[in-house]
Amino acid sequence: MASAVKVFLLDIEGTVCPISFVKDVLFPYALEALPHTLDSQWDDPAFAQYRDAFPAEYASSKEALAAHVRDLVSRDVKAPYLKSLQGYLWKNGYDSGEIRAPLFADVAPKFAAWQAAGIAIMIYSSGSVPAQKLLFGHTNSEPADLTSAIADFFDTVNAGPKTEIASYEKIASMHPQYPKNEWLFLSDNVKEVDAALGAGFQSFVVQRPGNPELPDGVEDRHKVIRSFEEL
């Protein structure tokens, strides 16, 4: 383990679960659920907050909103209002048992070990905080609900973009009891790792099965791990 780590700050996609879960399960599920949701809940006050978060030109009609969502997903645009809507759509899938998050086998045991050692676990993902809580609340692990192990959740709304140094500085400022050099951020995204390092965090690149090959030179510049067992 890296020296003096008091906080593990974890990415989700490609770090604790396969990239394919997000791309091949979650995104298609939301797109499939969207038309019925728009037809049945367009004027529902519970849905209105998600609809009205979209730019006005897209929130004006079901057709415009649906087309905009499909466009954003196809281009993998991480717009906060899209992430919030996706979380809302995924909730039904998680609640019904249709969706379970397939965590890598080392994740849940490490969560338990880190908790027992008094090390805080926090999450930082481009997915919305509600969507993060749904994912960790409905996993294939034992126990299936790991949310109680997680001290805090961060996304692009409450922290900022994951490739910006200021976002990590903001996260650290929310937990001033932990000096920046006691944080270890783990992500499959090299640009995110660079930003965390720039903020004074420790940070490693995670290379999981199904992740794209790392660019040349990454393993020369960064510590790369392939399992949390290496920590």
UniProtKB/Swiss-Prot annotation:
UniProtKB keywords: Amino-acid biosynthesis, Cytoplasm, Hydrolase, Magnesium, Metal-binding, Methionine biosynthesis, Nucleus
User: So where does Mg(2+) get bound?
Assistant: 11, 13, 188
Q: Which cofactor does it need?
A: Mg(2+)
Select a single GO molecular function from the record's annotations and give it: acireductone synthase activity
What's the protein name?
A: Enolase-phosphatase E1
Report the family membership: Belongs to the HAD-like hydrolase superfamily. MasA/MtnC family.
* HAMAP family reported in the protein's UniProt record: Salvage_MtnC_euk
Record function comment: Bifunctional enzyme that catalyzes the enolization of 2,3-diketo-5-methylthiopentyl-1-phosphate (DK-MTP-1-P) into the intermediate 2-hydroxy-3-keto-5-methylthiopentenyl-1-phosphate (HK-MTPenyl-1-P), which is then dephosphorylated to form the acireductone 1,2-dihydroxy-3-keto-5-methylthiopentene (DHK-MTPene).
Query: Catalyzes what?
Result: 5-methylsulfanyl-2,3-dioxopentyl phosphate + H2O = 1,2-dihydroxy-5-(methylsulfanyl)pent-1-en-3-one + phosphate
Q: What is its EC number?
A: 3.1.3.77
Q: How does it assemble?
A: Monomer.
